[in-house]
Design a protein with these regions (language model features):
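Disulfide-rich extracellular domains of secreted proteins
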Residues: 16-202
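Cationic, amphipathic, low-complexity alpha-helical segments enriched
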Residues: 1-23
């Protein structure tokens, strides 16, 4: 997900994920300016909903497969372009800024489930992710000053989620409009619903 400024008057003070208020997470100022401009968000999911206790398509509040940009990969009866391997996940979105726009600041934000009742991949959370712009592929390390890990308890199961961010202003300024994708995002997938209390995202 990128945050980009263009046209109309705005004041940008912080970047925060939706869990900040619930979990009393700190709001960290990433960019501050008073400019004629606007804010644009673009992004996509990395996970597809699953059926009960299997890695198959369904409508539970948990993911059963990652999206992959490699359409030769496929998980069970999920569509082509799916994987269980986080190093092969990836998702794309199109950025379309108005003509004449100038990018003042752009931030990449990613996250997912890192702890279930059976597994914990916290050692992988600071690994670089792959960020592909219209100009090419880039390895992006998370900014240590904004990293967030947090635990919640649902139905007696303690789950761990994380958020990482990185300043990608130069990359977006150079590439501007087109298709952007992010991949190799560490996250857990659990086929057994009790391990996540049907609560999972990436």
């Amino acid at each position: 997900m990128k945050e980009i400024l263009h046209e109309d008057l705005v004041v940008v003070r912080s970047v925060c994920n939706i869990f900040c208020l619930r979990l009393n997470m700190p709001i960290i100022e990433r960019y501050s300016a008073i400019k004629n401009g606007g804010i644009v968000f673009t992004g996509n999911t990395l996970g597809l909903s699953k059926a009960a206790n299997v890695a198959s398509p369904g409508v539970l509040g948990s993911i059963g497969a990652f999206i992959s940009l490699d359409t030769s990969l496929q998980v069970s009866t999920f569509p082509a372009g799916t994987t269980l391997d986080y190093t092969k996940n990836g998702s794309a979105a199109v950025l379309n800024l108005p003509a004449g726009s100038t990018v003042l600041y752009a931030e990449l934000v990613w996250g997912g489930l890192f702890r279930s009742s059976a597994n914990n991949i916290s050692a992988l959370l600071d690994n670089p992710v792959e960020f592909i712009t219209p100009s090419g592929s880039n390895s992006i390390a998370p900014d240590v000053s904004t990293k967030q890990n947090f635990n919640i308890t649902e139905e007696g199961v303690t789950l761990g989620f994380y958020v990482r961010t990185a300043n990608v202003t130069t990359l977006v300024k150079n590439a501007m409009n087109g298709t952007y994708s992010t991949g190799k995002v560490p996250a857990l997938i659990e086929a057994i619903d009790a391990r996540t209390s049907e609560t999972n995202h990436a």
